[in-house]
């Protein structure tokens, strides 16, 4: 109750921006979030058996869907984060394990779809009874065999520790369950013919090699599948108490006919009717006991899409989505300029039985599902990366020794430390924080294999980069690059991220590698494009993954507090140093390697001792004091290099060496610029390109004309170059949304914020917190009277921060003509009147006095304009830039909802005690109501002023 009491005031004050439902629904979601936090954070240190309430119980108690819960939880954490810190400590976010739970749900949803498709291809539904005429799988009644297979998989999956729980391993376990079903389900229920060579291509003299055939079809490893099948058989023997059949010849007369029994275990009468029911009961009990112990969500629902708790849509966070939305892929991977907004996961195609009934043989594996992409990239790791040596090649060693000092020992030692920090038990969530020595041998083997894959990939790409750099320099001395600490950490982080992304671990997800390696998002963004360019064999799924990461880095992560981008920006734009220091945005020094080794208890074995007790100054970003006092050429605020000029410069200077050089170091190939100016220029050009793509997509969705689109893009360009501070600690979409509305206002276009938000919700990168929670740091003198850090809705940010900052830029754009929506007639209104602004009515300029009753028939009091407020009022032209009264009185809410709320309160019959507070009623609101009665002229009201409350609109439900 303590957490709810302390957060209740936040709930009441933020009701209009928290959700799109009724107040009761919003309060219900809020209570669910509170209860989940208490159950996770308040029970720390208790035995697992005493953990109490689980998430599935919370969802049922508050009648919430999974998707709805995860849409509101991030916003809840933003609003009450400081309270959670005070109650539960600064590490509450890590202990909450919200991101891990999201990933687990996404994986289970993908695995559930994969299992449904595979089962329907292999076996008849409903125990051979004809299904109904509907083509939708989710309306068909699954058989007990179907339920048994999914339940067997869940029990098998729950036996794995959190360290190795990942989509790739789970898929292999699921295929092992399919193998068990194939050899035990009665032949009459099969949807395939075992003799058909197109179904099971791997054969020998003894019959079909089932394991090899399934590996070929589902892209799994034979070794991994054999190990998973052994685990499944052990589970059947230990939990279900079934004994393997010792007479192979007897078994081959039934389900094992024409199947090579080598490597397979057959349990006689295992799935006969009586045995099946008892086995289901045992598995149900085993799984439920595991749920009560671990407190996880009931994954049985993922075998049935109609489950009431499942819901539909995408999980909050943008990157994590429940599969089910069709998507199209680009054939070309590039920098964010070539990415598209359509990036939602693809839904699996519905199964259509073939005319001859042999669906398994005639259907193809659905491409581009989360499971199939994971298996494809895993095959690349097995076939291309795993066979490579775990040490630098001869050519790479020659590059190391050609430096001013042989850097071989430094590089190998660094790789061991950083990869050891990433691939340890502490890296895989709170549940595994006791390191690998307390995990099972299987976990340690899995982790060591992943570390070796990342190491081999790192050496492979590093060799390719060195080869390319040496060609540019016409020499093999790459000292400045190969001795750069930050560059190597970025390369190792990128390699490890690709390995982790391939296996899709539940607990070690981006940006975890940034924290483990000690780098920032801005650092990693420097190597992504080069990494892709120098690894030709990289699967397109991993290229897309890196592309999506680069977008995330550019859109918000590089702008967050503590980004090394600010350490370069303060050199390139010294005029921004005061604001950067005021907000405390500068990055902390990169932790040394010996500190990382000690923190993660990493043993280097036979490697040489650590030579990294102190990082050389030349490789680190210079401190802001040194950067601001050194003499250098300053990049003019409004100068912006073109891509052509950047391309010309890249021919004369290796981009990686300049990108990771000291910010204050002169760049001889850039006309006297410092490396910071060059790097910031490249970074901001990428920001501009990414913004251009999103502006185009959103404007097209809003059906805005090309002229409006160009104005919005021009405004964003000017903000990037002249008002860069608007992006500090914010998301670029927040600036784009405000630019679209601001341009619509000065272009006299009837476009509301509600329409913009409604269209933005349909964008694949949309996250509700983008428009619900915008960072502001109120100065000592602000219009709102607030001081310090805060998070406000997008409309408050637009009125209080955006417009005062960019108003001169909007004035320069000018109203010009009156562009209209495509396919809509132009309005013939007066050019001097602005859309969404209230009409002004005559109201005499009276001296300060008490409110006066102005109607004999209506209980209406009017507070005349006070002279004390005159200084704060805006001119009519200035008012036109703001979101004004007349559209709504609450954020994202329509006027009709305001009127309904007023009528409801008036008709409730409740007596309100106390006096009215006339200070909260805008004079203009009353003046407008009087003008409707008296027919007063709007023009004569100019003397009154135009102070208006902040516009707000309620989200559509």
Curated annotation (Swiss-Prot):
SUPFAM superfamilies: Cyclin-like (SSF47954). Keywords: Cell cycle, Nucleus, Repressor, Transcription, Transcription regulation. It comes from the Eukaryota. GO terms for cellular component: chromatin; nucleus; transcription regulator complex. GO terms for biological process: cell differentiation; negative regulation of G1/S transition of mitotic cell cycle; regulation of transcription by RNA polymerase II. Residues 814-854 are annotated as: Disordered. Residues 369-569 are annotated as: Domain A. InterPro entries: Cyclin-like_sf, RB_A, RB_B, RB_C, RB_fam, RB_N. Residues 369-808 are annotated as: Pocket. Residues 570-677 are annotated as: Spacer. It is found in: Nucleus. Pfam families: DUF3452 (PF11934), RB_A (PF01858), RB_B (PF01857). GO terms for molecular function: RNA polymerase II transcription regulatory region sequence-specific DNA binding. Residues 678-808 are annotated as: Domain B. Belongs to the retinoblastoma protein (RB) family. PANTHER family: RE32990P-RELATED, RETINOBLASTOMA-ASSOCIATED PROTEIN RB -RELATED. Regulator of biological processes that recruits a histone deacetylase to control gene transcription. May play a role in the entry into mitosis, negatively regulating the cell proliferation. Formation of stable complexes with geminiviridae replication-associated proteins may create a cellular environment which favors viral DNA replication. This is Retinoblastoma-related protein 1.
């Amino acid at each position: 109750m303590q957490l709810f009491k302390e957060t209740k005031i936040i709930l009441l004050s933020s009701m209009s921006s928290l959700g799109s439902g009724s107040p009761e629904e919003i309060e219900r979601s809020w209570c669910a979030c509170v209860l989940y936090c208490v159950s996770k954070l308040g029970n720390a240190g208790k035995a697992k058996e005493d953990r109490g309430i689980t998430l599935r119980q919370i969802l049922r108690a508050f009648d919430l869907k999974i998707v709805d819960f995860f849409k509101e939880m991030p916003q809840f954490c933003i609003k009450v984060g400081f309270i959670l810190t005070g109650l539960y400590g600064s590490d509450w976010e890590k202990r909450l394990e919200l991101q891990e739970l999201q990933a687990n749900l996404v994986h289970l949803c993908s695995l559930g779809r994969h299992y449904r498709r595979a089962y329907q291809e292999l076996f008849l539904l409903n125990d051979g009874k004809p299904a109904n005429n509907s083509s939708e799988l989710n309306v068909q009644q699954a058989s007990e065999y179907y339920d048994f297979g999914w339940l067997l998989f869940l029990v098998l999956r729950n036996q794995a520790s959190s360290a190795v729980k990942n989509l790739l391993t789970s898929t292999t376990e699921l295929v092992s369950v399919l193998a068990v079903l194939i050899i035990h389900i009665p032949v009459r229920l099969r949807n395939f013919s075992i003799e058909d060579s197109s179904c099971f291509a791997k054969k020998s003299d003894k019959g079909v090699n089932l394991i090899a055939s399934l590996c070929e079809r589902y892209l799994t490893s034979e070794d991994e599948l054999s190990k998973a099948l052994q685990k499944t058989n052990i589970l059947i023997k230990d939990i279900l108490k079934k004994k393997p059949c010792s007479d192979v010849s007897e078994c081959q007369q039934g389900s094992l006919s024409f199947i090579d029994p080598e490597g397979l275990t057959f349990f006689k009468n295992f799935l006969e009717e009586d045995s099946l029911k008892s086995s289901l009961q045992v598995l149900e009990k085993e799984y439920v006991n595991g749920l009560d112990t671990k407190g996880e969500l009931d994954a049985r629902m993922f075998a049935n899409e109609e489950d009431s708790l499942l819901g539909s849509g995408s999980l909050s966070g943008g990157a994590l989505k429940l599969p089910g939305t069709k998507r199209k892929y680009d054939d070309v991977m590039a920098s964010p300029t070539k990415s598209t907004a359509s990036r939602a996961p693809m839904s699996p195609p519905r199964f259509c039985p073939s005319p001859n009934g042999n669906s398994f043989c005639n259907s193809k594996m659905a491409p581009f599902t989360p499971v199939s992409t994971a298996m494809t990239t895993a095959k690349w790791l097995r076939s291309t990366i795993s066979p490579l040596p775990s040490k630098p090649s001869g050519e790479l060693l020659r590059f190391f020794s050609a430096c001013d000092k042989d850097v071989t020992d430094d590089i190998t030692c660094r790789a061991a430390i950083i990869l050891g920090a990433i691939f340890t038990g502490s890296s895989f969530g709170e549940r595994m924080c006791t390191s690998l020595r307390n995990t099972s041998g299987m976990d340690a083997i899995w982790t060591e294999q992943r570390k070796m894959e990342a190491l081999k990939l790192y050496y492979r790409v590093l060799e390719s980069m060195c080869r390319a750099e040496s060609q540019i320099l016409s020499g093999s001395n790459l000292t400045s690059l190969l001795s750069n600490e930050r560059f190597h950490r970025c390369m190792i982080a990128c390699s490890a991220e690709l390995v982790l992304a391939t296996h899709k671990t539940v607990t070690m997800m981006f940006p975890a590698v940034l924290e483990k390696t000690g780098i920032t998002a801005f650092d990693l963004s420097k190597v992504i494009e080069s990494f892709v360019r120098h690894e030709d064999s990289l699967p397109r799924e991993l290229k897309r993954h890196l592309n999506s990461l680069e977008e995330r880095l550019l859109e918000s992560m590089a702008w967050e507090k503590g980004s090394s981008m600010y350490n370069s920006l303060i050199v390139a734009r010294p005029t921004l140093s005061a604001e950067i220091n005021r907000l405390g945005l500068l990055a902390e020094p990169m932790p040394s390697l010996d500190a990382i080794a000690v923190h993660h208890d990493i043993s280097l074995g036979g490697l040489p001792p650590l030579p990294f007790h102190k990082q050389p100054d030349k490789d680190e970003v210079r401190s802001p004091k040194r950067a601001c006092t050194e003499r250098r050429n300053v990049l003019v605020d409004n100068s912006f290099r073109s891509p052509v000029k950047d391309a010309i410069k890249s021919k004369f200077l290796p981009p990686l060496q300049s990108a990771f050089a000291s910010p204050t170091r002169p760049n001889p190939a850039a006309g006297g610029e410092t490396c910071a100016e060059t790097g910031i220029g490249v970074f901001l050009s990428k920001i501009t390109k990414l913004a251009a793509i999103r502006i185009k997509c959103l404007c097209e969705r809003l059906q805005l004309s090309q002229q409006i689109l160009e104005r919005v893009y021009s405004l964003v360009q000017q903000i990037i170059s002249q008002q860069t501070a608007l992006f500090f600690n914010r998301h670029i979409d927040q600036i784009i949304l405000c630019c679209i509305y601001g341009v619509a206002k000065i272009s006299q276009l009837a476009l509301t914020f509600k329409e913009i938000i409604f269209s933005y919700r349909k964008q694949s990168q949309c996250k509700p917190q983008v428009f619900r929670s915008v960072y502001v740091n109120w100065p000592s003198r602000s219009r709102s009277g607030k001081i310090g850090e805060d998070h406000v809705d997008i409309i408050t940010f637009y009125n209080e921060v955006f417009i005062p900052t960019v108003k001169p830029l909007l004035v320069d754009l000018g109203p010009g003509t009156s562009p209209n929506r495509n396919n809509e007639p132009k309005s013939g209104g007066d050019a001097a009147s602005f859309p969404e602004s209230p009409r002004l009515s005559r109201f005499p300029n009276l001296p300060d006095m008490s409110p006066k009753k102005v109607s004999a028939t209506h209980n209406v009091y009017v507070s005349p304009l006070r002279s004390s407020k005159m200084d704060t009022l805006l001119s009519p032209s200035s008012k036109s830039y703001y979101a004004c009264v007349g559209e709504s009185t609450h954020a994202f809410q329509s006027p009709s909802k305001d009127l309904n709320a007023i009528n409801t309160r008036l008709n409730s019959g409740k007596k309100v005690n106390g006096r009215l507070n006339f200070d909260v009623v805008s004079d203009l609101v009353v003046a407008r109501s009087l003008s409707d009665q008296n027919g007063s002229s709007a023009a004569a009201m100019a003397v009154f002023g135009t102070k208006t409350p902040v516009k707000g609109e309620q989200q559509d439900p």
